[in-house]
Amino acid sequence: MNWIEYHSIKELPETIWTKIAGDNPCLSADFMEIVENLHPKDSYNYAVLYDNKEVVGVIFYSIFNALSSTLMKLSIGRVLMTGTFETYGKHWWYNTSYISECDFFEMFWQLIRKQNVLAFVIRDFVCNECQMNKFFGLHSFEHIIPYSVSWIKLNDSCMNLDDFLCEMSKKHRNMYKKIIKSRNDQNISFRKEYDIRKNLHKLYPLYINVNKRAKEFKSPPIPSSFFTGLERKFGHNCFCIIMSVGNKDIGFVLIIQGTDIIIPFLMGIDYKYRELHVWHNLTIECVRYAIETRITNIDLGLTNFELKKRLGAKKININMFARFKNNVVNRFCKSFLSKLL
């Protein structure tokens, strides 16, 4: 078996990438192309494992700088990681008829182990019961769980928002009914907007508000080109639900839609209107849209599970395995690995 590496999603045959992406719109080739354009200084690598001419495995990894700009120039803070910060889930696939999980990762390790990096991160095993296979133990990888995601799975019997609210606890059901009932008195309205570019001058500052206040998952702001890239690539499978008071837009949620899933990817909020429960209102409108379009799965993403569990969301851990390249550093500094993420 041998590896062939591609350095852009545009070079990789789409039939190969589909083995990883499946129906997930936020792992699609179009989405990966947008992500590549966001970080031109990072390295993107799509490694395909062949047995003669047969594709038996594929794995994606990126190399980025995790430390200060001074150290970046010296390449001291480079981290090799399967996946990106804009995506999650398994960024690999292998044919179990040809190779086991341990053997697949062993071959991948031989491919990457001499890279000039500070650390290696294998992400993501998205499950609450994650077993470390013998490869990770043999090579002294540390099991870390830096994040979790929240999912809502709608029942087939859920035909409208009232059905959904009835499944909540009495306390939370009454809370959301009160929020919805007060909308008329507060002159609140919602609209669905596909022309993101036209509204970007109003929406982007709202997104920056949320990004600056983030506590659980702090990351650099996504540039405005991300929004226009999504509109160009996804068409009507990407849109915003915008919340307004009178004629003023006070919040929005950006939704990316797949075959049976919607992903409220990010939000923007005017915090001067905090008392109008902007987050709750926008999230409940995401649920309403999913019900009306008969979509089963809502991926509410990272952060703030305490809010999301009121809606009946389930928490799923994002498991990673990581190690420093240097054996001595790895032995004594494993506890710092999560700080790189």
Model-found features: residue ranges?
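Short alpha-helix boundary/capping motifs
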Residues: 231, 317-319, 335-337
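A generic structural signal for secondary-structure junctions
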Residues: 22, 312-313, 337
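Short, Lys/Arg-enriched, disordered terminal segments
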Residues: 1-2, 99, 338-341
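Membrane-proximal basic amphipathic "stem/tether" segments
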Residues: 324-341
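Short capping/connector residues at structural and topological boundaries
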Residues: 169-173, 312, 326
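Acyl-donor binding region in acyl/amide transferases
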Residues: 43-44, 66-145, 259-320
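A conserved beta-strand-loop-helix scaffold within acyl/acetyltransferase catalytic domains
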Residues: 2-73, 122-275
